[in-house]
């Protein structure tokens, strides 16, 4: 194998590694916006327990501020050994779930804004339909906002 072939393979490997690394960290951000969702009317999958999950690859503790747009701002600390799980609520009228009868209204008191001093991962999970179904919303952070 020629040196020039090895050089080209090295450059391609390096480019692929950078490309993959960029996408793997796309969910890692210092700011996350979690919008509310709604349920189907007359559904057998009524939302039940809902949890906000926050984690980080950081070994050192990271301060996190969770702004529940309907209530208060709460401060927490997370690390890679101590992720955070916050109980959001139960049913179809919580900070995360909007009743289907309200979807045509302007809603300004639902959803979350999560801010941290170092990058964190954020997801919101719920169980529905007598514990038989589950769903998850994973925040892409600021990279999810586009250009």
Kindly give the residue locations of the regions a language model identified.
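Intrinsically disordered, low-complexity linker/terminal regions across diverse proteins
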Residues: 27-147
